[in-house]
Design a protein with these regions (language model features):
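RNA pseudouridine synthases
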Residues: 1-184, 292
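Short Pro/Gly-enriched beta-strand edge/turn motifs at strand-loop
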Residues: 65-67, 193-196, 207, 250-256
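Conserved hydrophobic positions within beta-strands
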Residues: 84, 174, 211-214, 247
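Glycine-centered flexibility sites
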Residues: 99, 143, 164, 176, ...
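The conserved catalytic core of RNA pseudouridine synthases
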Residues: 127, 133-158, 187-243, 267-302
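Short edge beta-strand segments in beta-sheet-rich domains
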Residues: 165-169, 184, 207, 260, ...
Length: 302
């Protein structure tokens, strides 16, 4: 379900044109309700909220929805250079560098996060909305992170994540030569009771599925493209280590840290459906310099 017509953002309001078959109904309110829920795909939770807050109104043949209200960022804006890979009124995709988390931990520390940088970007753009990351990346993993810029987008994208409709393609450089027969790793992942930060393959863990899309081999290492079907903490790192091919630089899971200093893992592509229009959006994130150098280094890939 999606909206295929024209739309305009006017301040806090989104204006849609449902068409004469809806606008001309004797009971326009009920016709609009059915159209929003059954054709556009608006989550019923949000529809009820907008109705309660008088956030739905007709203006001529246009149906207006308050989808862009003023909201606190939810995190302090802290300026940090931010590479924006994609942006419209509903979504933002930021390219996360290595060395920062997407969001803070429960201790509420002062460490800079990607959320802080996104809040500062919103502030500089004159946008007042909550910072809403749809997924996360490990601190030292690079690549695209998807943000919803309003509650409607958040509800739709969260649903798509749960239903595994958002594709995340990663590039990883691992130790050893991965053989062609290894195409899917379906092994549950749980916490390692002996190490606070580690995860491990565990029969009592949560289902975790990683698909290997392609393999390029050198004498010492392999370059993999992988797609996550699930999104468990450290999933690619745990799965590849368990298969005997830890990521280069990933000392937490048995990788040799000396030539790189972090796990050689980069989110290369993010593919999702636009929350309003349903248009398929594919975002490519350029490789960081350290990954490019590692790829070109003849010690690993030639």
């Amino acid at each position: 379900m999606s909206y295929q017509g024209s739309w305009d953002k006017r301040g806090e309001w989104l204006e849609l044109i449902p068409g004469k078959s809806i606008a001309g109904q004797a009971d326009r309110e009920e016709a609009a309700r059915q159209w929003l829920l059954e054709t556009v795909g608006m989550p019923e939770k949000l529809y009820r909220k907008l109705r309660h807050e008088r956030g739905i109104e007709w203006r001529g043949d246009r149906l207006r929805l308050i989808l862009f209200p003023y909201r606190e960022y939810g995190v302090e804006p802290v300026w940090h250079e931010l590479e924006v890979l994609y942006e419209d009124d509903f979504c933002l995709v930021a390219n996360k560098p290595a060395g920062i988390n997407v969001h803070g931990d429960s201790t509420g520390g002062e460490e800079l996060t990607l959320n802080h940088a996104v809040a500062a970007y919103y502030q500089a753009s004159g946008l007042h909305t909550a910072v809403r990351p749809i997924h996360r990346l490990d601190k030292d993993t690079t690549g695209p992170v998807l943000y919803a810029k309003n509650e409607y987008a958040q509800l739709k994208l969260d649903e798509d994540m749960r239903e595994k409709k958002i594709a995340r393609i990663y590039a990883a450089i691992v130790q050893g030569q991965v053989q062609d027969g290894l195409t899917t790793i379906d092994l549950p992942i749980g916490k390692d009771r002996h190490h606070r930060s580690r995860r491990r393959v565990s029969l009592t863990g949560q289902q975790a599925v990683t698909h290997i899309l392609s393999v390029e081999r050198s004498r010492y290492a392999s370059l993999l493209r992988l797609r996550l079907e699930t999104g468990r903490t450290h999933q690619i790192r745990v799965h590849m280590s368990h298969m005997g091919h830890p990521l280069i630089g990933d000392s937490l899971y048995g990788g040799n840290a000396r030539p790189f200093g972090r796990q050689a893992l980069h989110g290369e592509r993010l593919i999702f459906a636009h929350p309003l229009t349903g248009e398929q959006i594919e975002v490519l994130a350029p490789w960081p310099e350290d990954m490019l150098q590692l790829k070109e280094d003849s010690l690993f890939l030639s």
